[in-house]
């Protein structure tokens, strides 16, 4: 059934069910889902210890990340561009699925750059990107864990199929919760792009291994404003769901970034918790 006919004839819940079924079928047919059972070894491994999830937004320049050198730190994607990255030597490196819109060459460039620049003890990748990692023999002798994500309800159990991630910090948060970290501190996750219509990092975006076709040379979106706000709303809802889950489980998630839009978490200053 073509999408526009499907959406016109069927209620939203049934449409979502159809899309979820299609995505799960593809996930099982194209990937060895048994690989995610390895993640069971991570369950509550760091129970009661604190961690920091550090994003690549411009606000991360406001703090001295070397103050976290003796902490458990998650970074994501291209954080290796930070001038203090090697000295910080973060323990965890999280990567969501590379966009289907990317070519194989772009995916290879992205992953190769991470392989070259990052030597973290733990790497997390979407299982749908395993084929290219295997094909080009990337991350040899490195400790990889795969996440299986689809269009389903979030499980907060990375040894099972869980909900897909709209942004990298969502994956890092679910991993940290699964590993038993408490409290979990956030910084450098601004998520204010829809408000200011600028997609900036702490580094020059021209350094990115692959360019987002929806972002122009001035780091502004080519999409219409209503589309940006709709996407942002869906992303905020995902963070709100995590906040509710964490509150019910007595897990403290603290946002240390006053410039961030993540107001669903308690706010503190970075200097307060050192």
Model-derived segments and spans:
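Metal-ion/cofactor- or nucleotide/acyl-coenzyme-handling active-site neighborhoods
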Residues: 1-274
């Amino acid at each position: 059934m073509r999408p526009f006919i499907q959406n016109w004839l069927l209620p939203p819940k049934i449409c979502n069910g159809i899309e979820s079924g299609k995505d799960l079928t593809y996930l099982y047919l194209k990937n060895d889902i048994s690989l995610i059972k390895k993640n069971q070894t991570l369950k509550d491994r760091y129970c009661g210890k604190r961690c920091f999830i550090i994003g690549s937004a411009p606000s991360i320049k406001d703090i001295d990340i070397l103050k976290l050198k003796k902490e458990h730190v998650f970074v994501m994607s291209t954080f290796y561009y930070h001038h203090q990255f090697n000295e910080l030597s973060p323990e965890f490196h999280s990567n969501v699925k590379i966009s289907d819109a990317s070519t194989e060459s772009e995916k290879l460039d992205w992953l190769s750059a991470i392989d070259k620049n990052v030597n973290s003890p733990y790497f997390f990748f979407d299982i749908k990107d395993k084929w290219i990692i295997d094909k080009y023999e990337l991350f040899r002798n490195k400790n990889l864990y795969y996440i299986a994500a689809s269009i389903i309800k979030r499980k907060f159990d990375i040894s099972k199929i869980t909900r897909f991630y709209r942004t990298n910090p969502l994956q890092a948060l679910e991993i940290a919760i699964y590993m038993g970290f408490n409290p979990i501190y956030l910084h450098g996750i601004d998520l204010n792009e829809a408000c200011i219509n600028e997609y900036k990092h702490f580094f020059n975006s021209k350094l990115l291994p692959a360019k987002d076709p929806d972002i122009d040379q001035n780091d502004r979106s080519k999409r219409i404003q209503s589309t940006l706000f709709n996407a942002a709303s869906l992303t905020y809802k995902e963070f709100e769901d995590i906040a509710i889950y964490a509150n019910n489980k007595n897990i403290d998630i603290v946002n240390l970034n006053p410039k961030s839009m993540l107001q669903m978490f308690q706010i503190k200053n970075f200097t307060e918790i050192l």
